[in-house]
Amino acid sequence: MTTSMLNAKLLPTAPSAAVVVVRVVVVVGNAP
């Protein structure tokens, strides 16, 4: 897989991935 192909696949999913990261951080922060 080339870098351009990898970027083409990652760029569209970046916003949703960021949302998932934020949710995980919030859940972990509220866990204790």
Curated annotation (Swiss-Prot):
Function: This protein is involved in control of the biosynthesis of isoleucine, leucine, and valine.
Domain of life: Bacteria
Organism: Escherichia coli (strain K12)
Protein's recorded name: ilv operon leader peptide
Keyword Ion transport carried by entry: no
InterPro entries referenced in this protein's UniProt entry, alphabetically: IlvB_leader
Keywords for this protein: Amino-acid biosynthesis, Branched-chain amino acid biosynthesis, Leader peptide
GO biological process, one term: L-valine biosynthetic process
Statement: the UniProt record of this protein carries the keyword Amino-acid biosynthesis: yes
